[in-house]
Amino acid sequence: MASTLTLAAEGQVVMEDLTRSQLRGEIKKIETEFYQVFNRSIEDENLAIICYDYIPTGSNIKAEACEPQFVTDKRGNNANDARLGYDLLLTPTDLQSVLAAEYNALNAAMSELSAQSEYFRELNSILSALREELASR
């Protein structure tokens, strides 16, 4: 039996019929909507999820990263402080530890929205199913 997802405003999609590239495209569309719904629901802009393009070290191929505004801000401030000799450059693990309270607030905001919004829960469910399908290929 084929897995069918009902995607907002797009009807039904049979996941098994999608190529890896098409799956990635569907994931991108759902992620964009998921983050937009979340960002519209919050009052604290520091919790907003920001997506941006970057070029990984050693590559010429652009990649996209999506992360909370507080992570982007802290990483930038830490890099400037390290460059000026005021602080050590934080590793990703150190950054997560330093920002534990902010991550807890983000988790609470997402949980609250999930409890209040069936649409947000549906987007999350579709996104999980698409990612699982892509990972299984």
Predicted regions and their residues:
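N-terminal secretory signal peptides
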Residues: L5-R75
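Extracytoplasmic, post-signal-peptide low-complexity/disordered regions of secreted/exported proteins
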Residues: C51-D53, I61-K62, P68-V71, G76-A100, ...
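Primary mode marks residue(s) on the alpha4-beta5-alpha5 output face of response regulator receiver
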Residues: T19-Q36, I42, R83-R137
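Sec-dependent N-terminal signal peptides
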Residues: M1-S3
